[in-house]
């Protein structure tokens, strides 16, 4: 592990020089101490869903086109920047010292740049709960996979941030990548711009691929742990496997209903 840690420090100096804004005060101690607040946030989120749908039941839908464009555009830019910074770090580590270093050791927490973006990543999971408000206020179908995914991702991100789950680097990196495409699509759709017809299917396919890769990383984590070569726990493996497994089933089911079933259409996961 010392080798991987030393390498990550060297990598930061050679390839990941932080910008001034990325040297912001480290707020990890605060977030780690209050990570259980994510459960309260999720409870409030679920209650607001019930209240919001009840309130809108007898009212006309709101257009919210401009706010939705700005909302999606902001999250798209944020995700793209996070993708560029995180993929550069993870890919360099993987191709230099091997995949095991990125799966078994939380080396990403030792890098100032990644530390900054992981902090923002956690906060973004709270912000993204606002997606649901647009669905409710515009009276679009709110499907199970949407609110289940939003709420559990926040909980798991908080859990991983608190416990420095080794495979969390890939969880964050893949999520940034998928969201950079997804929110770009949502921006184009809200602005009524032309986009490839296959783009929604591509996004769902990327989401499914993310779950498959996440499950593979979890299995590798478990195998290498048996060799006493991974700094992980049974609890880490269990929750990672459970969440990736349920996400895979839900997104695969959505893909089948939306794109493979001959008749009938399903509303976009987060319109």
From Swiss-Prot:
Q: What is its main location?
A: endoplasmic reticulum
State the reactions this protein catalyses. Answer: a very-long-chain acyl-CoA + malonyl-CoA + H(+) = a very-long-chain 3-oxoacyl-CoA + CO2 + CoA; eicosanoyl-CoA + malonyl-CoA + H(+) = 3-oxodocosanoyl-CoA + CO2 + CoA; hexadecanoyl-CoA + malonyl-CoA + H(+) = 3-oxooctadecanoyl-CoA + CO2 + CoA; octadecanoyl-CoA + malonyl-CoA + H(+) = 3-oxoeicosanoyl-CoA + CO2 + CoA
Where is carbohydrate linked to this protein? Answer: 6
Q: A GO term (biological process) for this protein? A: fatty acid elongation, monounsaturated fatty acid
What does the tissue specificity note say?
Expressed in brown adipose tissue and liver. In the skin, strong expressed in the cells of the inner layer of the outer root sheath of the hair follicles and in the sebocytes of the sebaceous glands. Hardly detectable in the epidermis and not at all in fibroblasts.
Instruction: Give the matching InterPro entries.
Output: ELO_CS, ELO_fam, ELOVL3
Q: What is its EC number?
A: 2.3.1.199
Q: What class of enzyme is it?
A: transferase
As for membrane topology, the entry says:
Multi-pass membrane protein
Briefly explain the null phenotype: Mutant mice grow normally and are fertile. They display a sparse hair coat, a hyperplastic pilosebaceous system and their hair lipid content is disturbed with exceptionally high levels of eicosenoic acid (20:1). In the triglyceride fraction, fatty acids longer than 20 carbon atoms are almost undetectable. As a result, mice exhibited a severe defect in water repulsion and increased trans-epidermal water loss. When exposed to cold stress, mutants exhibit a significantly reduced VLCFA elongation activity in brown adipose tissue, but only during the initial phase.
What processing steps or modifications follow its translation?
A: N-Glycosylated.
Compartment list: Endoplasmic reticulum membrane
Q: Which GO terms describe its molecular function?
A: fatty acid elongase activity
Specify the inducers. Strongly up-regulated in brown adipose tissue in conditions of brown fat recruitment, such as cold stress, perinatal development and after diet-induced thermogenesis. A synergistic action of both catecholamines and glucocorticoids is required for the induction.
Its cellular-component GO annotations read: endoplasmic reticulum; endoplasmic reticulum membrane
Keyword terms, alphabetized: Endoplasmic reticulum, Fatty acid biosynthesis, Fatty acid metabolism, Glycoprotein, Lipid biosynthesis, Lipid metabolism, Membrane, Transferase, Transmembrane, Transmembrane helix
Chain ranges passing through the membrane: 30-50, 67-87, 116-136, 141-161, 165-187, 199-219, 236-256
Pathway the protein takes part in: Lipid metabolism; polyunsaturated fatty acid biosynthesis
**PANTHER family of this UniProt entry?**
ELONGATION OF VERY LONG CHAIN FATTY ACIDS PROTEIN 3, FATTY ACID ACYL TRANSFERASE-RELATED
* Subunit-structure text: Interacts with TECR.
Purpose: Catalyzes the first and rate-limiting reaction of the four reactions that constitute the long-chain fatty acids elongation cycle. This endoplasmic reticulum-bound enzymatic process allows the addition of 2 carbons to the chain of long- and very long-chain fatty acids (VLCFAs) per cycle. Condensing enzyme that exhibits activity toward saturated and unsaturated acyl-CoA substrates with higher activity toward C18 acyl-CoAs, especially C18:0 acyl-CoAs.
The record's HAMAP family line, in alphabetical order, gives: VLCF_elongase_3
State the similarity comment: Belongs to the ELO family. ELOVL3 subfamily.
Please state what the protein is called. Very long chain fatty acid elongase 3
Q: Which organism is it from?
A: Mus musculus
Q: Which gene encodes it?
A: Elovl3
